[in-house]
A protein has these predicted regions:
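Generic beta-strand structural signal
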Residues: 65, 95-101, 136-138
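Short, acidic/charged, Gly/Pro-enriched secondary-structure junctions
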Residues: 81-112
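Short, conserved turn/kink motifs that form compact alpha/beta structural patches or helix kinks used as
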Residues: 61-63, 67-93
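Short intrinsically disordered coil segments
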Residues: 82-88, 133, 153-156
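Short, surface-exposed beta-strand/loop "edge" segments at domain boundaries and coil↔beta transitions
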Residues: 18-24, 75-76, 104-114, 148-149
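Solvent-exposed edge beta-strands and adjacent loop segments
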Residues: 1-74, 117-136
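Short coil/turn segments at secondary-structure boundaries
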Residues: 115-116, 153
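C-terminal partner/receptor-binding element of secreted or periplasmic proteins
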Residues: 40, 135-155
């Protein structure tokens, strides 16, 4: 049985408590960088003591995600507004947004990340050596994660 792992139709819904309380949809994803990136996390740290016994411990970790969008798109403009509203500087206050992102997958499943903050972004445009404006990247960190299962069975 074949498995359809196509990402076509993927979108994000981004809500920020102060700047975008109603939220906005992100779907103008970059073609030269991973649109939605979730790095792997270590759930435990392992070591050996002097007698050769394994010692393990776990500690909470921030759940990080990166979204890459087409420069100048409406999605880029909204994410740029969110980034700038939360960037501090001399004489500039942060909006202190609490961010929630819902990832809407083509198979009907969703992932919700909550208790988040925007923590990286780009304060301007960059140009690649090929002459193309670089995709815009925005990073987030979250405290919580939940998911719903697919509504479309694999292989259909």
């Amino acid at each position: 049985m074949p498995y359809d792992v196509s990402g076509t139709g993927f979108s994000l819904t981004v809500k920020a408590s102060v700047t975008f309380p109603q939220g906005f949809t992100v779907s103008a994803f970059a073609d030269d960088a991973d649109p939605w990136d979730a790095p792997s996390l270590d759930v435990a740290t392992l070591s050996m003591n002097v007698n050769g016994d394994m010692v393990a411990f776990s500690a909470p970790q921030v759940l990080t995600r990166t979204v890459n969008v087409i420069p100048g798109s409406e999605d880029d403009n909204n994410l740029s507004i969110l980034y700038e509203a939360n960037r501090v500087g001399k004489g500039k206050r942060s909006a202190r947004d609490v961010v929630t992102i819902v990832a809407n997958w083509p198979d009907g499943s969703t992932e919700t990340l909550g208790g988040g903050k925007i923590n990286t972004g780009m304060s301007g445009k960059s140009l690649a050596s090929a002459g193309k404006i670089k995709s815009r990247s925005y990073g987030f960190g979250f405290e919580s994660y939940s998911a719903t299962r697919a509504t479309t069975p694999a292989g259909q």
